[in-house]
């Protein structure tokens, strides 16, 4: 069984037992959270698509850790004007373990 959930402005296809890195969620490590914005639920060749959400569906997950992604380097330059700008960015994430899908 799999589900498509929406969290942090992005959509993820998840199944029970998978690990997933999502945008940072304010929850403690080891806490169990519920992702209730389920867009679709499927099992085998059957698929249930919500409009926009599947009613009564939820995904239970456990917070494994919090961390930061690798640095993305931004470099801006204007030719012939001696203008250069260096910038870096590291996005925070929360790693989840999908425990169960309730449909």
UniProtKB/Swiss-Prot annotation:
Keywords: Ribonucleoprotein, Ribosomal protein, RNA-binding, rRNA-binding. SUPFAM superfamilies: L21p-like. GO terms for molecular function: rRNA binding; structural constituent of ribosome. Pfam families: Ribosomal_L21p. The keyword Cell wall biogenesis/degradation does not apply. GO terms for cellular component: cytoplasm; ribonucleoprotein complex; ribosome. InterPro entries: bL21-like, bL21-like_sf, Ribosomal_bL21, Ribosomal_bL21_CS. It comes from the Bacteria. GO terms for biological process: translation. Part of the 50S ribosomal subunit. Contacts protein L20. This protein binds to 23S rRNA in the presence of protein L20. Belongs to the bacterial ribosomal protein bL21 family. This is Large ribosomal subunit protein bL21. It comes from Ralstonia nicotianae (strain ATCC BAA-1114 / GMI1000) (Ralstonia solanacearum).
């Amino acid at each position: 069984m799999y589900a498509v959930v929406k969290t942090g402005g992005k959509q993820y296809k998840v199944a029970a037992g998978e690990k997933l890195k999502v945008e940072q969620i304010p929850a403690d490590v080891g806490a169990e959270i519920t992702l209730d914005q389920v867009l679709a639920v499927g099992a085998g060749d059957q698929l249930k698509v919500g409009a926009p959400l599947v009613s009564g569906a939820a995904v239970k997950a456990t917070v494994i850790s919090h961390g930061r992604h690798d640095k993305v380097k931004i470099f801006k330059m204007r030719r012939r004007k001696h203008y250069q700008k260096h910038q870096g960015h590291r996005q925070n994430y929360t790693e989840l373990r999908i425990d169960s899908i309730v449909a």
